[in-house]
Design a protein with these regions (language model features):
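Conserved acidic, metal-coordinating active-site core of Asp-based
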Residues: 99, 103-217, 224, 238
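Short active-site oxyanion
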Residues: 36-40, 64, 152, 212-213, ...
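Hydrophobic packing residues within well-ordered alpha-helices of enzyme cores
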Residues: 25, 50-54, 165, 169, ...
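Short, structured coil segments at secondary-structure junctions
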Residues: 62, 70, 173-175, 229-230, ...
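Asp-based phosphoryl-transfer active-site loop
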Residues: 4-18
Length: 268
């Protein structure tokens, strides 16, 4: 059965180490689209952080979709219509804010419009995230966050500090929230059962596609959920070694246009 939907992660997958889309990847995506294959960007980034990529890849046509915030938001790219929109409650935010202070890690909350931190000394990885996704940073106290629609929170810090903090996260937190590590310095916390996998499953059902007709390409732990729900999971050569254990295929690295290799080898 032919593959009709490809979900593609961005960082470490779609773009190379210079955060660029290679000509080979661009051409392969255009050829897949011309063949009637849905190419869906699936990322932890907010929508503002993928707008330029959607334009560059010409994925703004009627019937094109994008998955952002690690699955909390699914939209039609032509008009912004929301298919899925999940958010955290204010109580969830307070829960996470309190835990971050207890663990001694920086935290920020992300809405559809900006990045909010209650840390007066804004962490460098919050600044990094702001630059990466083209969103402004706002300092707000926890009390000032009550009226914000928070899509996800992130614990962000030096890798060794974050890893030590992760070991101390209470078990019940994993029962109440969806928690994924998207980079060595990022831990993402979302509403329970929200991840790239749930988003891709919903989208495939909406499009009437079977599991065998779906493919996902990723490199990091926050891609695990979507790799687990598709019939054709592909992991990048530069991907997490643990993730490769669940892959059907291993493609070339992101610096070798691995997405293009996957599309041309197993789709077209």
């Amino acid at each position: 059965m032919s593959i009709k939907l490809i979900a593609v992660d961005i960082d470490g997958t779609l773009v190379n180490s210079k955060k660029e889309i290679t000509p080979e990847v661009f051409a392969a995506i255009q050829d897949a689209k011309a063949a009637g294959v849905k190419v869906v960007i699936a990322t932890g980034r907010p929508i503002a952080g993928v707008a330029r990529l959607l334009d560059d890849l010409q994925l703004r046509d009627e019937g094109d979709y994008v998955v952002t915030f690690n699955g909390a938001l699914v939209q039609e790219t032509a008009n912004g219509h929301e298919i899925i929109s999940e958010s955290l409650t204010y109580e969830d935010y307070l829960d996470m804010e309190f835990l971050s202070r207890k663990l001694g890690v920086h935290m920020h909350a992300i809405t559809k419009d900006g990045i909010y931190t209650a840390n007066r000394n804004i962490g460098k990885y919050t600044v990094h995230e702001s630059t990466l996704v083209s969103m402004p940073i706002f300092y707000r106290t926890p009390e000032e966050m009550a009226d914000k629609e928070i899509v996800k929170c992130m614990f962000i810090d030096e890798p060794e500090i974050l890893d030590a903090a992760i070991e101390k996260i209470p078990a019940d937190f994993y029962e109440r929230y969806s928690i994924n590590k998207s980079a060595s310095f990022y831990l993402e916390l979302l509403k329970k059962d929200v991840d790239k996998g749930s988003a891709i499953t919903h989208l495939a059902e909406k499009l009437g596609l079977s599991k065998d007709e779906t493919m996902a390409i990723g490199d990091e732990e926050n891609d695990r959920a979507m790799l687990a729900v598709v019939g054709n999971p592909v992991v990048m050569e530069n991907g997490n070694p643990e993730l490769k254990k669940i892959a059907k295929y291993i493609t070339k690295s992101n610096d070798e246009s691995g997405v293009a290799h996957a599309i041309r080898t197993w789709v077209l």
